[in-house]
A protein has these predicted regions:
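Hydrophobic transmembrane alpha-helices that form the core helical bundles
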Residues: 16-48, 198-214
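Membrane-water interface regions at transmembrane-helix termini and the short interhelical loops
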Residues: 37-47, 61-82, 100, 134-140, ...
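Single conserved hydrophobic/aromatic residue that forms the stacking wall/gate
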Residues: 2-9, 13, 292, 299-301
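Hydrophobic, membrane-embedded alpha-helices of multi-pass small-molecule transporters
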Residues: 96-100, 108-169, 181-202, 277-290
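C-terminal membrane-solvent junction of multi-pass transporters and transport-like membrane proteins
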Residues: 261-302
Length: 302
């Protein structure tokens, strides 16, 4: 159900170790990417030049660390205020986008096939499956908590895709900061960018800390999360991350097969593999099937 530790169970530890390590790697990557994208948007809105971008990285990182140190159990009111503000501002943006029918229209191109776009879009929510379970694993009613999380996440994700596509068509821009500026949401846009970046990236960093505990039980997840945030800030300052296509393919190659095999085994084949430390057959199927898909992508017109 999740990648959190089950201490004393050697086989369980072996099974979860590989995906725990991969999960930490992808969460560190997401932390850096989110901070990088957030800093670009903040700097674009405030127009502070080259220095402004790394200052924005540090400020966003500091806010994420604050969220982590406050602790998930004490974030109730803070998260409620942040989410309410973000929700209201997003609705304001929706009214502007859908109330304005005079958009310029963004020209399409053939830089990415429809299938590739779908695959990369699916890779993101699939990579969040281990993250979601880090927050639902201790729920009093795990099934209801997981179902509610999945439905809400899916609905909001579709909403965000619609907003992004519509805003891009309206303004002729793909840069979220420029879209917000053209939408007349300069200050409100700044608040949206900062709140969405901090609240989302907090989840990445915190989950990386939780997953690290399943690799080394003596580690404290909160402090690992802080370290992950610091690494993310440094990476966001040093490395350009404008094109994350390869990163999305990487996590897609891990988490799409993982959940596909899990669903097929548990719900369709009804196989109980709890007694096995590692299922060699599934491990082999994983890279072979994904390599085959990538090799025949053009033939399938995806």
């Amino acid at each position: 159900r999740d990648v959190a530790p089950s201490r004393g169970l050697g086989d369980v530890y072996k099974r979860q170790l590989l995906f725990s390590v991969l999960n930490v790697i992808q969460l560190v990557g997401w932390t850096a990417i989110m901070i990088y994208d957030g800093s670009l948007s903040v700097n674009s809105i405030l127009n502070m030049g080259d220095t402004g971008r790394w200052i924005a990285c540090i400020v966003i990182g500091a806010l994420i660390v604050l969220w982590i140190l406050v602790g998930i159990s004490n974030l109730g009111k803070l998260n409620t205020i942040a989410m309410a503000a973000l929700f209201i501002l997003t609705i304001v943006m929706c009214f502007f986008i859908f109330g304005n029918g005079n958009g310029m229209g963004a020209a399409g191109d053939d830089s990415m096939s429809f299938g590739a776009a779908v695959e990369l879009s699916v890779a993101m929510p699939l990579s969040w499956l281990p993250l979601i379970s880090d927050y639902t694993r201790e729920a009093e009613k795990p099934f209801k908590a997981t179902l509610a999380s999945t439905l809400v996440y899916g609905a909001v994700s579709c909403w965000m895709y619609i907003i992004g596509m519509s805003a891009s068509i309206l303004t002729g821009e793909s840069d979220i900061a420029k879209i917000m500026l053209k939408s007349g949401l300069s200050i409100a846009g700044l608040v949206i960018v900062i709140l969405s970046t901090v609240t989302t990236t907090f989840l990445d960093a915190y989950s990386a800390g939780i997953s690290s505990e399943s690799i080394f039980s003596k580690l404290k997840g909160k402090y690992v999360a802080v370290a992950v945030t610091i690494v993310g800030v440094i990476a966001a300052i040093v490395y350009p991350m404008d094109d994350i296509t390869d990163f999305l393919y990487l996590i897609g190659s891990v988490f799409a097969p993982m959940i596909a095999i899990q669903i097929a085994d548990f719900f369709i084949l009804k196989k109980d593999r709890a007694s096995k430390a590692v299922d060699i057959c599934n491990i082999i199927v994983w890279p072979v099937s994904y390599t085959h898909l990538r090799a025949h992508e053009t033939e399938l017109h995806l």
